[in-house]
Structure formats: C-alpha cells, structure tokens
Design a protein with these regions (language model features):
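C-terminal alpha-helix plus adjacent terminal tail
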Residues: 1-24, 30, 56, 67-71, ...
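A short, well-ordered alpha-helical element
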Residues: 14, 37-61
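Terminal peptide-recognition signature
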Residues: 26, 45, 63, 124, ...
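Glycine- (often His-adjacent) and acidic-residue-rich active-site loop
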Residues: 57, 64-97
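Glycine-rich beta-to-alpha active-site loop
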Residues: 96-145
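Gly/Pro- and small hydrophobic-enriched strand-loop and loop-to-helix capping segments
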Residues: 128-151, 188-200
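Well-ordered beta-strand positions
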Residues: 128-129, 169, 173-175, 181, ...
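Hydrophobic, secondary-structure "cap" segments at the distal end of domains
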Residues: 155-165
Length: 256
C-alpha cells in the first residue's frame, strides 16, 4: 500500500480513510459534523470520484455520513443562479458526472446509511450493498421544494431500487420511507442499530477486499451494466429538464 495520497486532504466535505487492505471509507461532513450539501460539494464530488477510480490501491469503497444523519441539509443558493443558462451549465456538467462515475466506479461500493437522507439519497441507494441504520429514512426534499424536476440520477436510482411506480409516487409526493420499508422492497440489504452500521459495512468491505482485485473490479462492472447504461441515457435529458425548470423560476409570480 502506498503512502496517503494528496487527494485525501484536498476536498473540504469528504473525509477519507483507507485500511491496509484497500477499503476506502468516504465520509460526508461539514466542519466535522453532518454535511450541508453546497455548490462546493457538487463541484468536488465528481473530481474526487475520478481520483478514487484511478487510485488502484482502492479496492472497495464505503460511503457514509457523519453523526446521526447521512445527508439532510442543502444550501441551494451556493449552487449559483440556476435561472440563467450559464449558471446552470456547470451544474448540468457536474450533475451528469456524479451518478455516472458512481455507476462506473470499478470497485464494489457499500453504503453505510447512518441516519436520515433527504438530499441526494441516490448516492446511498446506488451502492452494490446498502446497510442502513434503524433510524434511517429516505426522501427527496430539494427538487420539488426548490421548484425543479428530479433529473440528476435520483429518478433512475429510485426506479431501480424501489420499482417504477413506487419511485414515482415518492418523488411526486415527497413522501418518506423507512429503512425497514426499504429492506422489504429490496432497496436495503440489512437494517441494524445505529452503532453497528459502519462496522458492518466495513466488515463486508474487508471480506471483498480479500478477494482478487480483478475479480471484484470486474464483478462491479458486470453487476452495474444496466444502471450505468441508464445513467448514460437518462441524465442528459434529466439534467436538461432540471435546468429548464430552474430557468422557469425567474418567471413565476413569486419571482417578480
């Protein structure tokens, strides 16, 4: 195993730690506490995923949050003026690359959902194995609340994880489903007490890291072919429609 790479300390919202066997744990945070998703997070994540992918010392990725939640807060203003084409263009670029790079990451991904996730729950549910806390709840707060359509990959991941009709129901009603419900539907593999979630995810990751690396890499590619293809087909239109609905906000009565 090589020394700690420079990119481990490059990004302010991601704490990275790698075991000797090659299990990389990515923890979302803001100043050491639960993360507030910002324009910086959105900009940095596709870059980080690219660096993770090209670092061949990374054998398995574990994704988790900080404290008692996975991700529930977002600073919409920090994403820029999405009502203008050039303002939304960078969000379009980043928004397509994040889910595609997760889908194409050549290693197993395990999510340790340590609590509620109402912002970018697709980051948790796209994982090959989802381990959730008994306190975890899933929903999509930002899109309809902010007046934009959900086209950044959430629509694809939810359809794959929940089923098409159920995904549409929860996206349009902004309803919340529990970890237990998600397990019943097949979206979550295991539901555990909060203090056991990360340890269990890392245990599974260590088991995978002990296998031949080409095996786990190519297994990940094989098992994610469908969702990778759907991301390539669906996020271009999805993000374009997000941009159109964002632009429309400037013309709504409350904006005048």
């Amino acid at each position: 195993m090589s020394s700690t790479p420079d990119y481990f300390d490059r990004y302010e919202n991601f704490a990275l730690k790698r075991s000797e066997s090659g299990v990389l744990t990515l923890r979302f945070h803001t100043n050491g506490g639960p993360v507030t998703f910002t324009g910086t997070t959105h900009s940095d994540l596709p870059r980080l995923l690219e660096e993770i992918a090209f670092d061949r010392d990374n054998k398995v990725l574990v994704i988790t949050g900080t404290g008692d939640r996975f991700m529930t807060e977002i600073d919409g203003a920090s994403l820029g003026d999405l009502t203008k084409p050039m303002g939304s263009d960078i969000t379009y670029l980043e928004g397509r690359r994040i889910p595609q790079r997760l889908a194409d990451l050549e290693m197993p991904i395990i999510s340790a959902v340590n609590g509620p996730v109402s912002v970018h729950s697709e980051y948790a549910l796209i994982a090959d194995i989802v381990i959730a806390s008994e306190t975890a709840e899933f929903s999509d707060f930002p899109h309809l609340t902010m007046g934009i359509s959900p086209g950044d990959g959430l629509h694809i991941v939810w359809e794959e994880a929940l089923g098409i009709n159920r995904a549409r129901y929860y996206a349009l009603t902004q309803g919340t489903f529990t970890a237990a419900e998600a397990k019943e539907w097949g979206a979550v593999a295991e539901v555990l007490p909060p203090d056991q979630v990360l340890a269990r995810a890392q245990e599974l990751a260590e088991n995978l890291a002990a296998k031949p690396q080409l095996l786990t890499r190519y297994a990940a590619i094989t098992l994610r072919q469908r969702i990778s293809r759907r991301m390539a087909e669906g996020t271009a239109l999805g993000m374009a429609l997000e941009s159109l609905t964002a632009a429309n906000l400037a013309y709504l009565p409350q904006a005048r």
